[in-house]
C-alpha cells in the first residue's frame, strides 16, 4: 500500500481536516490545526506531503521521524500540528486495514469509560450558573470556565474580587454536587497568579489551568508549593521535549497535551507514559473537532493516568458548525452520565461526511482570536 494524495479542508468554526488517500482505496482522516493559524499549518502539511507521497502508510513511526527530523529546524506549534494531523490519519488507515480500533492496536483498554467535562462560557456569574444548570440536565457534573478576564501585570483588588466573586457564587449555587476547573488561559502574571490562587483556594476548584504562560513554566513549582489546588498545563507545549522540562521541574499535577498540536497519537502516547512515571495525570486538551476528540479518546483508553477528557460540544467558539456536524456515526460519541465509552469502529472510529466537508470548506472562515487591550491600550493576553 502506498500514499497517493493528501487533501486539506479548512472548515467552520475554526477547524481543519485532512484526508490521506492510498492506492488500495483506504482513506485516513486527521485534524491538524492551530486555531487562528490554519492557513500556516495547511502550508506545512503540504510541505510535509513531499516526504509522504509514495510511502507505505503502515510505517507510522518511521514517517513520524522523517517529518520531525528530516528538516534541520523542528518543533513548535506549526510543524507539530501538521505532523499531528498526518499522524492521526495514518493511525486511522492502519486501524481500517487491520479492522481494529486504534486503542486495540496500542495494547487494549485500561478502562471502560472516561469522564468528560464541558466548557461553560459567560462573563457574568448568573450566565455561568444558567449554563451549568442546562448542562447538568444532559448528564454533566464536571465543567471548566474562565478563571478571570484580562489582568494587568500588577492589578488592583477589584479585579481579583471580580474573579473570586464568580467562583464563590458558583460554589454557593451547587455546593459539592459539581466539580469545575478554572482556566487562567495564560492571562495572569506570576505575581498576580500567587494572589488569585490564594483567594480561590476556599472554593476548591478541581484544577487551575495555565496559571501562567508555558514560557513562564519555572513558576509552576513555586505556585504549586503555595496551594493545594492541582495545577494543569500543556496545551501550548508541542513535543515530549517540551513536556520533559516541565515534568522534571515539578509543580504540574495534570498534563494537557493537545492531540492536534503535540505530534498526534504517536507523540502523545509517549508524553502520557512520561507523565505516569512522574505520577502526573493526563487530561488531553480538546476544544476542537471530532477527529481530534477521537484521537484523544484512543489515548485516554490506553493510558492508565488519564482522568478527564475535554470536549467542545456547545463551546462558544463553535459558530457555523457543532462538534458532530461532519460526523455520520454521531451515536458512537454519545455520553452516559458524563462519560465517553470507547469508539469501536476500525481506525479512529469516525465516519466523516465528506460531501458536507467539501461543501462547508468552500466558505471557511479565517478565525482569529480576539485582540484585547488593557486600560492603558497595551496588549493584553487573551
UniProtKB/Swiss-Prot annotation:
Its EC number is 4.2.1.6. CDD domains: D-galactonate_dehydratase. Signal peptide: none annotated. Pfam families: MR_MLE_C, MR_MLE_N. Its cofactor is Mg(2+). InterPro entries: DgoD-like (IPR034593), Enolase-like_C_sf (IPR036849), Enolase-like_N (IPR029017), Enolase_C-like (IPR029065), Galactonate_deHydtase (IPR023592), Mandel_Rmase/mucon_lact_enz_CS (IPR018110), Mandelate_racemase_C (IPR013342), Mandelate_racemase_N_dom (IPR013341). The record marks 258 as: Increases basicity of active site His. The record marks 310 as: Transition state stabilizer. One of its GO terms (molecular function) is galactonate dehydratase activity. One of its GO terms (biological process) is D-galactonate catabolic process. Binds 1 Mg(2+) ion per subunit. The active site is at 185 (proton donor), 285 (proton acceptor). Keywords: Lyase, Magnesium, Metal-binding. Mg(2+) binds at residues 183, 209, 235. It catalyses: D-galactonate = 2-dehydro-3-deoxy-D-galactonate + H2O. It comes from the Bacteria. Pathway: Carbohydrate acid metabolism; D-galactonate degradation; D-glyceraldehyde 3-phosphate and pyruvate from D-galactonate: step 1/3. Belongs to the mandelate racemase/muconate lactonizing enzyme family. GalD subfamily. Catalyzes the dehydration of D-galactonate to 2-keto-3-deoxy-D-galactonate. Reaction proceeds via an anti dehydration. This is D-galactonate dehydratase. The gene is dgoD.
Amino acid at each position: 500500500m502506498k500514499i497517493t494524495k493528501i487533501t486539506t479542508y479548512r472548515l467552520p468554526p475554526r477547524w481543519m481536516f485532512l484526508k490521506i488517500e492510498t492506492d488500495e482505496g483506504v482513506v485516513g482522516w486527521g485534524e491538524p490545526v492551530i486555531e487562528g493559524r490554519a492557513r500556516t499549518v495547511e502550508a506545512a502539511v503540504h510541505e510535509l506531503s513531499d516526504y509522504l507521497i509514495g510511502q507505505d502508510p503502515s510505517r507510522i513511526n518511521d514517517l513520524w521521524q522523517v517529518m520531525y527530523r528530516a528538516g534541520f529546524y523542528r518543533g513548535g506549534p506549526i510543524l507539530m500540528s501538521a505532523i499531528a494531523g498526518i499522524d492521526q490519519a495514518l493511525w486511522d488507515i492502519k486501524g481500517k486495514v487491520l479492522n481494529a480500533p486504534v486503542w486495540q492496536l496500542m495494547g487494549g483498554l485500561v478502562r471502560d469509560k472516561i469522564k468528560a467535562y464541558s466548557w461553560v462560557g459567560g462573563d457574568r456569574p448568573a450566565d455561568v450558573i444558567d449554563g451549568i444548570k442546562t448542562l447538568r440536565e444532559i448528564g454533566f457534573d464536571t465543567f471548566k470556565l474562565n478563571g478571570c478576564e484580562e489582568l494587568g501585570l500588577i492589578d488592583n483588588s477589584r479585579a481579583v474580587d471580580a474573579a473570586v466573586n464568580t467562583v464563590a457564587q458558583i460554589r454557593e449555587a451547587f455546593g459539592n454536587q459539581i466539580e469545575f476547573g478554572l482556566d487562567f488561559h495564560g492571562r495572569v502574571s506570576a505575581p498576580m497568579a500567587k494572589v488569585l490562587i490564594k483567594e480561590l483556594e476556599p472554593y476548591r476548584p478541581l484544577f487551575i489551568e495555565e496559571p501562567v504562560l508555558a514560557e513562564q513554566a519555572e513558576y509552576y513549582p513555586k505556585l504549586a508549593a503555595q496551594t493545594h489546588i492541582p495545577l494543569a498545563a500543556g496545551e501550548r507545549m508541542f513535543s515530549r521535549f517540551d513536556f520533559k522540562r516541565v515534568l522534571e521541574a515539578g509543580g504540574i499535577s495534570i498534563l494537557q497535551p493537545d492531540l492536534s498540536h503535540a505530534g498526534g497519537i504517536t507523540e502523545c502516547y509517549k508524553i502520557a507514559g512520561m507523565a505516569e512515571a512522574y505520577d502526573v495525570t493526563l487530561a488531553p486538551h480538546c476544544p476542537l473537532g471530532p477527529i481530534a476528540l477521537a484521537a484523544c479518546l484512543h489515548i485516554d483508553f490506553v493510558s492508565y493516568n488519564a482522568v478527564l477528557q475535554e470536549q467542545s460540544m456547545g463551546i462558544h467558539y463553535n459558530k457555523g458548525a457543532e462538534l458532530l456536524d461532519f460526523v455520520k456515526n454521531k451515536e458512537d460519541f454519545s455520553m452516559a452520565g458524563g462519560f465517553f465509552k470507547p469508539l469501536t469502529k476500525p481506525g479512529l472510529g469516525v465516519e466523516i461526511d465528506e460531501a458536507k466537508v467539501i461543501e462547508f470548506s468552500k466558505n471557511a472562515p479565517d478565525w482569529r482570536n480576539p485582540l484585547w487591550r488593557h486600560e492603558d491600550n497595551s496588549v493584553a493576553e487573551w
